[in-house]
């Protein structure tokens, strides 16, 4: 059992993570960042929940780029094959649930 105060978590580098759980190959990680990630496509599904801060999520569908701002409490679901990149607007803390070892 553990309690994690996500707003207190800060990593040593952007996108640094605290591994919370690995449940039958599904990883749950808390990330801290103040810098954009990179465009990528995950091996499978990804759940991206903003716990603190704001994040501009850019994604491509049928080659067309879209963008939306995720506020604290918002969740982005990336289905397999969804190309996306997260750009925090200041500091952000994000809970990511995905296949262990995914990009």
What is the meaning of each model-derived region?
Residues 1-30:
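A short, N-terminal "cap"/entry segment at the start of jelly-roll beta-barrel domains
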Residues 26-42:
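Conserved short histidine dyad/triad with adjacent acidic residue
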Residues 30, 57-59, 96:
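Short hydrophobic/aromatic-rich beta-strand segments that constitute the beta-sheet cores
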Residues 35, 44-62:
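Glycine- and acidic-residue-biased ligand/ion/polar-headgroup-sensing regions
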Residues 38-41, 45-50, 67-68, 86:
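His/acidic/aromatic-lined binding-pocket segments of jelly-roll/cupin-type domains
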Residues 51-52, 71-72, 90:
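A cytosolic small-molecule/anion-sensing beta-strand core signal
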Residues 61-80:
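Short acidic-glycine-tyrosine-enriched beta hairpin
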Residues 80-103:
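Ligand-binding loop in jelly-roll beta-barrel domains
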């Amino acid at each position: 059992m553990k309690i994690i105060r996500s707003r207190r978590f800060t990593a040593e580098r952007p996108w640094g993570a605290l591994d919370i759980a690995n449940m039958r190959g599904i990883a749950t990680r808390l990330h801290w960042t103040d810098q954009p990630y990179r465009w990528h496509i995950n091996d499978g599904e990804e759940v991206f929940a903003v716990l603190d801060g704001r994040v501009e999520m850019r994604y491509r569908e049928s080659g067309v780029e879209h963008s939306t701002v995720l506020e604290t409490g918002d969740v982005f679901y990336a289905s397999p094959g969804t190309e996306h990149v997260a750009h925090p607007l200041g500091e952000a803390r994000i809970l990511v649930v995905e296949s262990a070892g995914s990009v």
